[in-house]
């Protein structure tokens, strides 16, 4: 019997073809079409507190946020929009519920876009004509943001609960009202707390229209739970080519939402990777404290912008192989660490010097990469 070893003949399945969608401008950020998938977040400050809101927007911008949303539940908040929109370094979307008058206030204030919730704005259907005319005159797109928790009562009566079909019908109905007034500068979201329902709703929507889609799992929960839900839902849809902009909803500081959203895009190859740390989960073979080592290396390299892969490995099983695959890596054991740079062992250091040596080598490689402008194959750091 002949046994042939080698790679499987079937190629890896690529991500799905990007869904065709019309393109809109949210300020200076393109959404839809062939534009990169953008990352959004939402301020947790009182919008009426202009300074606090602008300070949080600055933090979000520094973390990589491209579009920010602010809540407008009161007249004081509406009055603050002009100053915020004027001074914000990234496009500002006004989030409107209940009162249609705030939609007009947001447009007049110079917001880059307005999100409306058709499920709870008073007499919304009757106001669509006025909203469409005002938004069209100002060049302001409208996001029709359908949420499971505030679905129109007529649809709840029809479907019994917030099903994928109910969410989709709500969005398409409101789109049709805007279309009657020749307004199509629209993007849509159909959010649900259950990732499975959310995925099904967006699939239906993607087949039914060509508007750009804003992905989100509403009320996703605390940081860990919300990260898992969003990663599952966004990963499934983006892998199918569905989704043009994302917002990870977490019961956590908004900057954390941006970090998670960016990481999801990077993991799918939809955003150029920066620093990536790969580490093993540890086991009885590990001869170093992998957790501490990985955390120390990660902290020491935080903020690095170049696409560097660093591998921190704790034993001799996968350690040397993983380290060789990375730009920089360490394979640890017997109180020592072998330092690999682009596949070659360059030195062996005592365990106490591993972190310091890795950081020094990473900084040196980063300077080289920045100088010659040639990124590595993939930015990542591996710890195993």
From Swiss-Prot:
It is an enzyme of class 1 (oxidoreductase). [4Fe-4S] cluster binds at residues 280, 283, 315, 322. Coiled coil: none annotated. GO terms for molecular function: 4 iron, 4 sulfur cluster binding; 4-hydroxy-3-methylbut-2-en-1-yl diphosphate synthase activity (ferredoxin); 4-hydroxy-3-methylbut-2-enyl-diphosphate synthase activity (flavodoxin); iron ion binding. Its cofactor is [4Fe-4S] cluster. It comes from the Bacteria. Binds 1 [4Fe-4S] cluster. The keyword Metal-binding applies. Gene3D superfamilies: Dihydropteroate synthase-like, Sulfite Reductase Hemoprotein, domain 1. Keywords: 4Fe-4S, Iron, Iron-sulfur, Isoprene biosynthesis, Metal-binding, Oxidoreductase. Its EC number is 1.17.7.3. This is 4-hydroxy-3-methylbut-2-en-1-yl diphosphate synthase (flavodoxin). It comes from Frankia casuarinae (strain DSM 45818 / CECT 9043 / HFP020203 / CcI3). The lineage of its organism: Bacteria, Bacillati, Actinomycetota, Actinomycetes, Frankiales.
């Amino acid at each position: 019997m002949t046994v042939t070893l080698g790679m499987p003949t079937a190629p890896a399945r690529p991500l799905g073809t990007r869904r065709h969608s019309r393109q809109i401008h949210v300020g200076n950020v393109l959404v839809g079409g062939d534009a990169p998938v953008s990352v959004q977040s939402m301020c947790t400050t009182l919008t009426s507190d202009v300074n606090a809101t602008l300070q949080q927007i600055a933090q979000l911008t520094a973390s990589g946020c491209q579009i920010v949303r602010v809540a407008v539940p009161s007249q004081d908040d509406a009055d603050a929009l002009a100053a915020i929109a004027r001074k914000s370094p990234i496009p500002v979307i006004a989030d409107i519920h209940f009162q249609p008058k705030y939609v007009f206030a947001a447009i007049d204030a110079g917001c880059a876009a307005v999100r409306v919730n058709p499920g709870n704005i008073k007499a919304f259907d009757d106001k669509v004509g006025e909203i469409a005319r005002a938004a069209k005159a100002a060049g302001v797109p409208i996001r029709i943001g359908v949420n499971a928790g505030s679905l129109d009562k007529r649809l709840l009566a029809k479907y019994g609960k917030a099903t994928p079909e109910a969410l989709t019908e709500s969005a398409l109905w409101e789109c049709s009202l805007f279309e009657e007034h020749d307004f199509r500068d629209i993007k849509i979201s159909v959010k649900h707390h259950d990732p499975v329902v959310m995925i099904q709703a967006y699939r239906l929507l993607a087949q039914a229209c060509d508007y750009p889609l804003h992905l989100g799992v509403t009320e996703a929960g605390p940081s860990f739970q919300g990260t898992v839900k969003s990663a599952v839902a966004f990963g499934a849809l983006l892998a199918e080519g569905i989704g043009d902009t994302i917002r990870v909803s977490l019961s956590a500081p908004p900057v954390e939402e941006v970090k998670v959203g960016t990481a999801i895009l990077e993991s799918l190859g939809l955003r150029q990777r920066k620093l990536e740390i790969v580490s093993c989960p540890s086991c009885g073979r590990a001869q170093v404290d992998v957790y501490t080592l990985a955390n120390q290396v990660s902290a020491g390299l935080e903020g690095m912008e170049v696409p560097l892969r660093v591998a921190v490995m704790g034993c001799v099983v996968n350690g040397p192989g993983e380290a060789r695959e990375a730009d920089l890596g360490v394979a640890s054991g017997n109180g020592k660490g072998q330092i690999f740079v682009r596949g070659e062992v360059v030195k062996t250091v005592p365990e106490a010097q591993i972190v310091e040596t890795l950081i020094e080598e990473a900084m040196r490689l980063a300077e080289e990469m920045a100088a010659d402008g040639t990124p590595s194959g993939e930015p990542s750091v591996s710890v195993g």
